[in-house]
């Protein structure tokens, strides 16, 4: 997958379905009192025909209200940091960082349901999957018409340890499947976790001020 596409990739009603209620209860339990998360991820991207485009893995960290860190370790390194005001995308092998203002794309990420569950019904139509899949309870999220989202549909899969998987399908049918592990709740983040400072010799593209 092209590097620029990586980034395009971070309920109030009562429902009758037992499976859906279980998934919502899992979400509510997982997010109750949540201020930050730190864990590992593995990611697979496939095209509309199911062909694998990329496998990758690394570390993810999230913190309220609008901070995140995606640190790809394999197959090559890339760092994406959102500090609440700006988003930095650093490619070490290119010695280049791209920076831009943090906007609606981050706020409309399906992961926003973890650190700000109140947005769930405001931004998505939430539906149930017919039955558990991969041993998980799933919530399907479809962006509402007036939501500026970069995907067509997302699914969150919950197990006994909370969020275990996330699947995202974009406008051209490309599917991104992410598995999470080793979640640490409300960790004591290092001061620079959600901060990026360009190193010596790094080209800065965009407005870093």
Swiss-Prot record:
| Biological source species | Xanthomonas campestris pv. campestris (strain B100)
Gene3D superfamilies (alphabetical):
Lipoprotein localisation LolA/LolB/LppX
Keyword list, A-Z: Chaperone, Periplasm, Protein transport, Signal, Transport
The UniProt gene name for this protein comes to lolA
Q: Where in the cell is it found?
A: Periplasm
Role, per record: Participates in the translocation of lipoproteins from the inner membrane to the outer membrane. Only forms a complex with a lipoprotein if the residue after the N-terminal Cys is not an aspartate (The Asp acts as a targeting signal to indicate that the lipoprotein should stay in the inner membrane).
* Transport as UniProt keyword: yes
Question: Looking at the keywords, is Lipid metabolism present?
Answer: no
Pfam families from the entry? LolA
Coiled coil ranges (UniProt) are none
Print the organism lineage: Bacteria, Pseudomonadati, Pseudomonadota, Gammaproteobacteria, Lysobacterales
Name a single GO biological process.
Answer: lipoprotein transport
InterPro entries per the record? Answer: LolA/LolB/LppX, OM_lipoprot_carrier_LolA-like, OM_lipoprot_carrier_LolA_Pbac
Listed under GO cellular component are: outer membrane-bounded periplasmic space
> Protein name, please?
Outer-membrane lipoprotein carrier protein
């Amino acid at each position: 997958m092209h590097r620029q596409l990586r980034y395009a990739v971070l309920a109030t009603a009562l429902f009758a379905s037992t499976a859906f209620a279980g998934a919502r209860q899992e979400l509510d339990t997982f997010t109750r009192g949540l201020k930050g998360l730190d864990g590992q991820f593995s990611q697979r991207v496939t095209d509309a025909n199911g062909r694998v485009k990329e496998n990758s893995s690394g570390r993810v960290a999230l913190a309220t209200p609008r901070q995140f860190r995606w640190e790809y370790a394999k197959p090559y390194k890339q760092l994406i940091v959102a500090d609440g005001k700006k988003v930095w995308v650093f490619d070490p092998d290119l010695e280049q960082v791209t920076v831009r203002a943090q906007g609606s794309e981050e706020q409309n990420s399906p992961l926003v349901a973890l650190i700000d569950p109140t947005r769930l019904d405001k931004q998505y139509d939430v539906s149930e999957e017919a039955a558990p899949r991969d041993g998980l309870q799933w919530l399907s999220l479809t962006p509402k018409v007036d939501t500026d989202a970069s995907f067509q549909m997302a699914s969150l899969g919950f197990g006994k340890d909370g969020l275990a998987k996330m699947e995202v399908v974009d406008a051209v049918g490309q599917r991104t499947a992410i598995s999470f592990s080793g979640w640490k709740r409300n960790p004591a983040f290092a001061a620079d976790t959600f901060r990026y400072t360009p190193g010596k010799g790094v080209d800065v593209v965009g407005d870093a001020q």
